[in-house]
Amino acid sequence: MKMERILKVFDSNYVKLSRPRCPELYFASDYFNEIFDSLKSLDYSNVKQGIPRDKGIYFWFVGEQVNYIGIAKNRNGLYGRVALQHLNEKYLEFRESKQNPELDKFQLSQAVQTLDAEGNAKIGIDKSTFRKKIGRKFKLKPGSETVSYIKENGTLKFTTINNIEGKSLDLIEATLIAFFQPPLNTAHTGAVVTKLSSVPVGQEVTVLK
């Protein structure tokens, strides 16, 4: 896949992130361009061996469009988020309190059925936020159907970002979601990214570390 057009979107020296009820932040554009320069495509036929347990960020592309962005900052890193959750058809939500009767109406009608330890019936839908968004939008069954859709319709790219605090990863995610506005991301509503040639006098560049 040719990425040149996407790689050059941050063609200014700096970017400003504006969010409701938050101070404006300024970042060097080169940092984000380096993220794209280091992206690797995940081999869907070898998911568990193809993705590390490091912290990082991942993108789901449909063609050249960024359709979903996520970060991984917990103990199992990208491996835990992508391999064990998003692309694991057995990663399902059986807790009724976490199932939305309206938004999850279709998946609930096609839910995976099983029994709990006491022999009571329970039903499960997608637990992965990424798969849940896809299932709701395209009316796909939980589990194998949403996993197959991800693999068959887009390319998942990722890069590791080590030696960084979780809050900085959150800012990276917020900036990229605000800029690309992926259709499957609903977080960071109201955030705006502005490209700048210079930082205003009196403002400092935030170092992501």
Which role does the model predict for each range below?
Residues 1-67, 71-209:
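Boundary/linker segments flanking structured domains
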